[in-house]
Amino acid sequence: MLDIDTILAIIISFLIVLIVMPIVIPFLKYLKFGQVVRDDGPKTHHKKSGTPTMGGLVIGLAIIVTSLIFYKKYPAIGAPLIATVAFGLIGFIDDFIKVVLKRSLGLRAREKLVLQFLISITFLYVIQKHLGSDVYLPVINRYIDLKWAYVPVMSVLMVFTVNAVNLTDGLDGLASGVTMIVSLFLAIISIFSKNHDMAIFSGAIVGSCMGFLRYNAHPAVVFMGDTGSLMLGGSIFAIAVMLKQPVLVLVIGGLYIIEAVSVMLQVLYFKLTKKRIFRMAPLHHHFELLGWDEAKVVVVFWIFTILFCLLALAMIQLKI
């Protein structure tokens, strides 16, 4: 199902993270780039305070190096790579404010959204000029041309996806594991679509997340930080844009969507009733407070991600 170049991309990015991370972790500790844990979070997370963060820098390094290795043969890799780096830069600034300037919430929400929309609009404007404004809708099994609505609609979806991935990054191995599965499926879809450039880029993400899991699985010795989560969110949706499959990526990334919607519902319901739907949002914290072990929550969410990917595959095969 995967061609040799995609497999090589997975292996290369995996090895880069596996080799570089043990060098970077002590350096992050030396710089005191430790995770700031909020007091209103689950009590079991308080012991994670000080765990090195910004490990997403190594994920980014692996994706960049792997992409550059294959760039000459697969030049279309450049487009999602630029989006990935741009969103990673926002995450880096956010992390820097948290861990160095000691402002636990990082960039203000408005600041973050403005930067995210600027990147999304710029990226999508350029893509529209080169690839057009048509997108595939699996529900009606046809391409539709969004025309003038392409940039605004897709920008909203891109920013939503980026922040949904960010919200998913709350448990050891959760965001990295889910993104590894999603990226693997995107690699397969890319090959079926004969888009080998996106297969390679997806493979680079698969390998980097796989390597990162070695250090991020419970009990994590490093976190990706917003550097990693915003970067991965941007990369996932950028691939979807290149494949003209934004709806499909929302299906395979269904776990991200559920996490984000749980936060939106919690906030809205609390404002209206002063009561909460969940014990805590995002949803993974709700299950923690119900007494589920952290590793159990992560594995169950991985399984649901696989099911979402199978649902997407069924939609493709049955032309739903």
UniProtKB/Swiss-Prot annotation:
Membrane-spanning ranges: 7-27, 50-70, 77-97, 113-133, 148-168, 173-193, 198-216, 221-241, 247-267, 297-317
Pathway of action: Cell wall biogenesis; peptidoglycan biosynthesis
GO annotation (BP), single: cell wall organization
EC number, UniProt record: 2.7.8.13
PROSITE patterns (UniProt xref): MRAY_2
Swiss-Prot/TrEMBL keywords: Cell cycle, Cell division, Cell membrane, Cell shape, Cell wall biogenesis/degradation, Magnesium, Membrane, Metal-binding, Peptidoglycan synthesis, Transferase, Transmembrane, Transmembrane helix
Membrane topology reported for the UniProt record: Multi-pass membrane protein
Keyword Chloroplast annotated: no
GO molecular function annotations of the record: metal ion binding; phospho-N-acetylmuramoyl-pentapeptide-transferase activity; UDP-N-acetylmuramoyl-L-alanyl-D-glutamyl-meso-2,6-diaminopimelyl-D-alanyl-D-alanine:undecaprenyl-phosphate transferase activity
Gene Ontology annotations for the cellular component aspect, listed alphabetically: plasma membrane
Pfam families noted in UniProt: Glycos_transf_4, MraY_sig1
Name of the protein this chain belongs to: Phospho-N-acetylmuramoyl-pentapeptide-transferase
Organism ancestry: Bacteria, Bacillati, Bacillota, Bacillota incertae sedis, Caldicellulosiruptorales
